[in-house]
């Protein structure tokens, strides 16, 4: 069973990441030295705990966004994703021989919206191929 981290350690780590994200790495020793240079931390033990939790959060950030932490690079990436517009529309009938291939749910949605599009309903299997299954 692991140890519980205090609120002080968590707050300090989040503040470090938000301010100094580009300088931090996935290496504990590097983060420890950076904590020493940047912040005035009372004890060596507290500094090590903060550096360790910072390293842990950096590893989580590599996998995806972490709740409670926002830094400039993450905000820019989120903004870019929100502003994304595909080059070719999925509703472009000239590319698909005048008929859109959709599943049952999409067909019902299009009908409920009152759009008059030529649709071809295709059955979609709920089971994915083994090769593409996510591994935990």
From Swiss-Prot:
Gene Ontology BP terms: cytoplasmic translation; ribosomal small subunit assembly
Localisation: Cytoplasm
SUPFAM superfamilies, per database record: Rps17e-like
Taxonomic superkingdom: Eukaryota
Chief location: cytoplasm
Family annotation (InterPro entries): Ribosomal_eS17 (IPR001210), Ribosomal_eS17_CS (IPR018273), Ribosomal_eS17_sf (IPR036401)
PROSITE patterns noted in UniProt: RIBOSOMAL_S17E (PS00712)
Keyword Nucleus applies: no
GO molecular function terms listed in the Swiss-Prot or TrEMBL record: structural constituent of ribosome
Keywords linked to the UniProt accession: Cytoplasm, Ribonucleoprotein, Ribosomal protein
CC per GO annotation: cytosol; cytosolic small ribosomal subunit
Summary of the function given for this chain in its UniProt record: Component of the ribosome, a large ribonucleoprotein complex responsible for the synthesis of proteins in the cell. The small ribosomal subunit (SSU) binds messenger RNAs (mRNAs) and translates the encoded message by selecting cognate aminoacyl-transfer RNA (tRNA) molecules. The large subunit (LSU) contains the ribosomal catalytic site termed the peptidyl transferase center (PTC), which catalyzes the formation of peptide bonds, thereby polymerizing the amino acids delivered by tRNAs into a polypeptide chain.
Entry similarity comment: Belongs to the eukaryotic ribosomal protein eS17 family.
Other comment: Present with 30500 molecules/cell in log phase SD medium.
HAMAP family: Ribosomal_eS17
Assembly information from the UniProt record: Component of the small ribosomal subunit (SSU). Mature yeast ribosomes consist of a small (40S) and a large (60S) subunit. The 40S small subunit contains 1 molecule of ribosomal RNA (18S rRNA) and 33 different proteins (encoded by 57 genes). The large 60S subunit contains 3 rRNA molecules (25S, 5.8S and 5S rRNA) and 46 different proteins (encoded by 81 genes).
Entry-linked NCBIfam families: PRK01151.1
Designated name of the protein: Small ribosomal subunit protein eS17B
Organism: Saccharomyces cerevisiae (strain ATCC 204508 / S288c)
């Amino acid at each position: 069973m692991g140890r519980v981290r205090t609120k002080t350690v968590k707050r300090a780590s989040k503040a470090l990441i938000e301010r100094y994200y580009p300088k931090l790495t996935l290496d504990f020793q590097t983060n420890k030295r950076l904590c020493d240079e940047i912040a005035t931390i009372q004890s060596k033990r507290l500094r090590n705990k903060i550096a360790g939790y910072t390293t842990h959060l950096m590893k989580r950030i590599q996998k995806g966004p972490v709740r409670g932490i926002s830094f400039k690079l993450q905000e820019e990436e989120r903004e870019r994703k929100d502003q994304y517009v595909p080059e070719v529309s999925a509703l472009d009938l000239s590319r698909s021989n005048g008929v859109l291939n959709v599943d049952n749910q999409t067909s019902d949605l299009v009908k409920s919206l009152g759009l008059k599009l030529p649709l071809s309903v295709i059955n979609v299997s709920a089971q994915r191929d083994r090769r593409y299954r996510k591994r935990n």
